[in-house]
């Protein structure tokens, strides 16, 4: 079996932890959302299940009719992902939901079809209308509580908190300049400003005593004589002091005790007082009690309502229902598990499951938050304000959650419709069933809208496997509920200490989205609350253990974390008493006895793509950013070649991107061709794994996807072995470019400004040749005037032009086409004009058809040429118009299909029986198995499984069996479930194929009779103007292709393949490219591949040693000779091997010329841009240049006949045809537009004709 090449490394020992599955973010999230493969009763209250349980039951307004949700059921995809791409349809499954309706006539249950729901492919993508798309994870502000501070204009620091729910109204409390706390709801500062004390009362704390008891500890102090006055003067009363007989109030709760008041109270005979410990008249609570205009629960409620809804009558019922709706109704206010977790953690409440399930606000939350805010104001050291850019306060919404939120809004729309229909239904004439009142439109349209229009559902970047992988691991702060790129400040975009090991500090786009779109670090995971975690090794008693702990950013704050590169002895103890470590985001030299954790790997800091840059530690961050981004733009080449200098991540990146085919199980290769690999399983050779290879498919970005087998018949393979290479991979490793012999030197000025000089030898060897595939589509429709027809019989077209078309009017495969060639001939009916009688007679005699149809053929657009690689035709079959022969042929096909279906079903049954036998035969039953519906006991507890019992289980459906959870039965459930899924899939495939034989392509759009897709492949060689780059941000444009004989050569006669400008290195500070050059030269000479992982790569000394070992110059510089003159250059030059990439900015796609073309309707000036066949804009500054030279005639024709002088254009055409040399320009159309605009403003502007 073929294995990846072993790479030489200087790393002392391998990482303790392997990288997690790199697309797990996507797959895990969507799996949790749909819970595919779980029985209805096993489903947890998350994802789609949670949404249905939230919205249902729905009751009619009079509560006589109730619609309950029972369970949902997902079908099997009708087509495979590849077939969906081919047909241009969505890869989805049907969603059926079982409801129970209870009304006056009784109880009815029904399964209702709720439309289709897109499902994820194994690679973590969706196929929507035939295009692969990715849903990007969104980083947003976490629900919960945040404490903040801001400086007032008078210099005071004002503290505030904000309770942010997952859904619902924001609650904000702010200190003002007078130390009073005001509550704002939904950030409406002026209109909804409510004193916090009023709000507390409205929550149900009606008396002042209740409120004081909540905020202070209360002590009872004796008052027997005037001696006790000293201890009591200045203290604050915690309760009213009332005369028992006369009910007179001598002291109110919250009042400060004075000597006179104490005397009055002593005279009444009161012997003890309740005192608020720690309260004084300056305490915010005491101040607010004095300021509060209300004194009871009812008054506070009304005041709250009045401020919230000024102008509306404040009744008690209205006020109570408003506050309930705002914060205590789970349908309108939801903190979510995350919000509750964050709030409880901050305020010190318990974090058990029961508490975390309380999603609405509680009174205790508001009191707790106000207490914390007051402690913060008082300067309590145990309190702190929150940093909103810290990753403890930002969380990730992955695919599942984003779609769940959209489903919720769709079902909420449906809820209104259901209520309306329940009310309007006429029970006298018909019986009500769930199917009659449920409309699936709401859910379907919301999902369709999300996948096709949402900012977070993006067309997948498929330029190469790395681009694909990165797209799935991308994090965006934009999108609905996120930030706005115009308003986002510097702080949000900046790298934060908490990003370490979670978000890559390097990989982000240049331009307006910098810092808003980021990438997950290589080891990062997302936990159940949506916070990003990173792994650390646990350190106990100074010993670094192999135990791994995943930590979120807030937990990490409390730990002292050593670097992964800290040196350990053979007992895993630190070699030195002091090492570099991090604590609360700051790096310092820590005593090793205080270290609690250690990094898992130095590369946990960066993302996968950044981790592919060798010698990253020697590159400036700005250039590393460019290097990361440009690797994603590398075009897959015809001949792939792995990098000599890698980082060790290449194999893993290729595997997780899905570009290569990997063995799922151990086995032996039984059959190999370019389309399929068959592996017989090791445990049971009768069972086969079949791997279909992708051949010359078009990717989203027009590059070519092609897989080639690496194994041979008889090879023994183990799980995870590479069976086939894909695009931009070489022997299972990522291979984005070529290893090229470069020299850093100027050469006749051709490499000025980062330009690149390449040898013609690279072109001859097809080193940088790539294949591009263009797709052209044409549809024939049924129009009002008649049917369009795909045919070879096109009016007014010569036979020469039709040479490459087949009899059916479609170009033959293998034909070479160039711009303007016909790919598919099509004629469209023209609207019939009134004909003269003699014309009608002639038409009748000669039967001229050409007059009533027009040519609407598909032609090759400008700038495209290549070979027709594939043609796909989709058409509907009309049942009535089939001939007898066709019907006979159809029957034969159907018979063959049925035979194939039966044989496959029999094979499945045999495999299923074998699996059950292997698990159960002669084993003892750990628990009874009961039939749900009949309640029959199929297997007694303790019984021995025999063949008969196994056959009995084999016939039953998993849904009908009650199986107790245990190890053996869990495996049994998996076997039964996978068998049922396989049978279901086989049945769907059979029905789909049968339907296709009978109906043709029934899923074509309405009105389409036939659809033809033509694929044209073109080979693009490297040419002048193409953009190339290394992995260190060293980019440039090919300026000259030099004959091999003229290139500089080494003393041994070997010519250099590429020349780079040495001035591109010092100012850019990307020295990684120089080290790569030296190490690449040494490794190439030694015939080995090396890996230099980021931050733990080859030291310089080791590179020099390798150079000397291989007999290369120890300074890495060689004397070169000029290929043109044969003379030696004066100075020594750095020569070595660099891995250079060809980027997808090819000159062939950008070069453009126009002779004639379309004009803008309003201004009558030529359109702009290549896509519109536009012209080059000759703008104001260009006009100045011509004016400076005084070229009057050229100026005149540029501003008139070459632009928007409509009559002049026609005249100049005529004069060119006649061979005259005459320019008579008229009025430019833009002048008329100006006049019309002024007239539109009501100005009477008319050009005056003055006689000369």
UniProtKB/Swiss-Prot annotation:
Keywords: DNA-directed RNA polymerase, Nucleotidyltransferase, Transcription, Transferase. Gene3D superfamilies: 2.40.50.100, 2.40.50.150, 3.90.1100.10, DNA-directed RNA polymerase, subunit 2, domain 6, RNA polymerase alpha subunit dimerisation domain, RNA polymerase Rpb2, domain 2. It catalyses: RNA(n) + a ribonucleoside 5'-triphosphate = RNA(n+1) + diphosphate. InterPro entries: DNA-dir_RNA_pol_bsu_external_1, DNA-dir_RNA_pol_su2, DNA-dir_RNAP_su2_dom, DNA-dir_RNAP_su2_hyb_sf, RNA_pol_bsu_bac, RNA_pol_bsu_CS, RNA_pol_bsu_protrusion, RNA_pol_Rpb2_2. Coiled coil: none annotated. GO terms for cellular component: DNA-directed RNA polymerase complex. GO terms for molecular function: DNA binding; DNA-directed RNA polymerase activity; ribonucleoside binding. One of its GO terms (biological process) is DNA-templated transcription. The keyword Transcription applies. PROSITE patterns: RNA_POL_BETA. The RNAP catalytic core consists of 2 alpha, 1 beta, 1 beta' and 1 omega subunit. When a sigma factor is associated with the core the holoenzyme is formed, which can initiate transcription. DNA-dependent RNA polymerase catalyzes the transcription of DNA into RNA using the four ribonucleoside triphosphates as substrates. This is DNA-directed RNA polymerase subunit beta.
